[in-house]
């Protein structure tokens, strides 16, 4: 079996073309993996959003609620480094769900890759 590749179209959040973070790289990566026949219908897995209870293993209830309800303060948004819009919230939850799925598939298959890796902008609170 080919290495499981976890990917979701929502990994490319709508943060604006002028944002310094190259968010489009996540869409380009899956295109390249397909072009090189590394990823295909048989080994691409689409994650679901991570559950709130899973998030609460690491983050405070207040922080998760603020992210989920798009209600961070302007200082908290600045610290996060991304605009707080639904596509960013969705991407965060789906990417984390992708990490959970990759972990489960790696246990079963010895290896798995989440194409949303490298987005370390979360805080416990």
Whereabouts are the PLM-identified features?
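HDAC/HDAC-like amidohydrolase catalytic core signature
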Residues: 1-125
